[in-house]
Amino acid sequence: MILDTAKIPWIPKTQIENAALDLLAQWGKFSGQEIGSPIPVEAIVEKYLGITLEYDNLDEIIGIPDVLGATWVDEKRMVINSFLLDGREGRFTFTCGHEVAHWVLHRKFLLHQTEDAFISGAKNNPAVVCRVSASKTRGEWQADYFSSCFIMPGPKVQEAFYKVFGGNPLVIYNRKSCFGRNNPIVLDPSLDTAHQIAKNVMDAGRFLNVSREAMAYRLEDLGLLINETGLLLSSGFKMSKPFPKRSKGKNLKNVAT
């Protein structure tokens, strides 16, 4: 049985962010360490949440394409598609945070769904399966936002931004910089320099395991980067490599789309 994330109830952004910060605070108390970047997502998953974290070819395990991650609630098992280990650390970390979000925010809905299935006599193996093609559903958006707040905590991002750029937000009016995309002396806020703005913040805050694109969108969400172009911030980034095509494997019993 797979959780239908399109049917997840609405959760306010502030509640999602608070849930992410609460988890970080719990980890800090558990580990006795100050919360700092990079956020040790894998350690939090395994040592604090007690979830088994694995890396495997999910296309073959589940039998459906474009799966980034999956979590089996009853088994306390989380599996990340092994292709993300191939030099995609930012996307890998974000996907781990995304799966953590499903555990923190959504597992109660899956367990409730499981109880209903048990009463009706249906067999089930409760799972949350995250596909690229389903990234726009309400529950998947919530998981993405949680991951962003979790691996890039607002206070830490703000601290790093102020260290580099001062107390005022940067406003983007143009698609292209007047001084060139990679000018080493002048950084003109524009869509094609958003990647460099993000990198400067990442370097200052030691956000070593996040992508530039994810950081740029986090800066925008925090009101530190204001995009007045009417275009998406991602239009200034190089296109990510497409999800690799793999042969379709055998379906995992009791897991359906």
Region spans (language model):
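Active-site hotspot residues in diverse enzymes, especially metal/ion-binding acidic/histidine motifs
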Residues: 1-257
